């Protein structure tokens, strides 16, 4: 397939005029490709200048190597979605009817216990650290949402209960259904405030700024620093002393961590590391700090980082 792609790019795409407008099929962060830009429109001329796959002097074998090198295995929901497309799945109306089931706190608790549901808190990364339902996990709907659900929740039939800002419940359900999660069974009516008003406890995730972490690192105490970005991002550049612990494989690798140790987590900007922290806390890890602003903020401190490397195969 990579060889055929080489031919189609050179024989059908590259001969077109430079002012041809290009729209991406996928956005930055998608597992459907690598080195994808966040821009939503481009020109073929711009792509010829900056896209590694369109360099004129690249040989077939060089193209195949660059395209395939460093590719990680696809998220587990990809093949499951293929089977759903072949055999069919529930219609969106039925999924919405089931999922748009607003529950009071008592009903929500009962449904959680009886179905062994997964509670996903979809609020913002700014809100969640200050108070969320214990044992729920955070995946924010305002950021890369459905792909991370698909990567981190192995069972597409998993019953899901939703915590969402008022008025956004339907959006969450639709976005879950787009990647095959057709079993949301309801949401907490009144959200986190209803839970709080009922007198139930809230959990928190400790956070600190990059500057605060730099001061902590300067005390001489042992620091366990986890970089939860993808391996390609880590290889490009990372904080000295950080261990790569990609969020993509957290379920597989969690046993490698010691729940009695304190861990500091960072990603690119603070979103993925907060997901990781919530998942670790749901599995019994208590001594966790999320570094706000992620690597971008850490790089601006006096702490050492590796020299930047050009990784053409970055995902």
Q: What is the predicted function of each stretch?
A:
Residues 96-107:
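A contiguous, basic/glycine-rich beta-loop/short-helix subdomain that forms a polymer-engagement track
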Residues 12-14, 107-113, 212-219:
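Short amphipathic alpha-helices and their capping/turn segments at secondary-structure boundaries
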Residues 17-18, 113-116, 133, 156-157:
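Short, well-ordered loop/turn elements at secondary-structure boundaries
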Residues 107-123, 138:
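Conserved, hydrophobic alpha-helical core segments of structured domains
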Residues 24-28, 34-35, 80-82, 122-124, ...:
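Short, well-ordered beta-to-alpha junction loops that form the rim of enzyme active sites
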Residues 2, 46-83, 87-89, 97, ...:
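Rhodanese-like catalytic fold shared by cysteine-dependent sulfurtransferases
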Residues 1-74:
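Metallo-beta-lactamase
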């Amino acid at each position: 397939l990579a060889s055929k792609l080489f031919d189609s790019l050179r024989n059908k795409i590259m001969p077109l005029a430079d002012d041809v407008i290009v729209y991406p099929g996928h956005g930055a962060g998608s597992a459907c490709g690598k080195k994808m830009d966040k821009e939503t429109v481009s020109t073929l001329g711009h792509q010829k200048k900056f896209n590694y796959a369109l360099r004129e002097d690249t040989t077939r074998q060089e193209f195949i190597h660059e395209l395939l090198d460093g590719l990680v295995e696809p998220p587990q929901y990809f093949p499951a979605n293929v089977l759903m497309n072949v055999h069919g799945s529930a219609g969106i109306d039925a999924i919405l009817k089931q999922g748009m089931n607003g529950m009071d706190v008592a009903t929500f608790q009962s449904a959680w216990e009886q179905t062994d549901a997964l509670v996903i808190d979809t609020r913002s990364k700014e809100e969640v650290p200050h108070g969320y339902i214990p044992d729920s996990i955070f995946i924010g709907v305002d950021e890369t949402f459905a792909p991370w659900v698909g990567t981190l929740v192995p069972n597409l039939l998993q019953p899901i209960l939703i915590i969402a800002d008022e008025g956004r419940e339907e959006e969450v359900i639709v976005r879950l259904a787009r990647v095959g999660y057709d079993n949301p069974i309801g949401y907490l009516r009144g959200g986190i405030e209803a839970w709080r008003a009922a007198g139930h406890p809230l959990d928190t995730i400790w956070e600190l700024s990059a500057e605060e972490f730099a001061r902590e690192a300067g005390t001489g105490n042992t620091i366990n620093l986890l970089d939860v970005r993808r391996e390609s991002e880590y290889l490009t550049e990372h904080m000295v002393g950080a261990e790569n612990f990609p969020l993509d494989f957290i379920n597989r690798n969690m046993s490698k961590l010691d729940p009695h140790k304190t861990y500091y987590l960072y990603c690119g900007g603070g979103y993925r590391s907060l997901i990781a922290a919530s998942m670790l806390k749901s599995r019994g890890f208590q001594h966790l700090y999320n570094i706000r602003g992620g690597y971008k903020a850490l790089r601006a401190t006096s702490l050492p980082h590796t020299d930047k490397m050009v990784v053409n195969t970055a995902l």
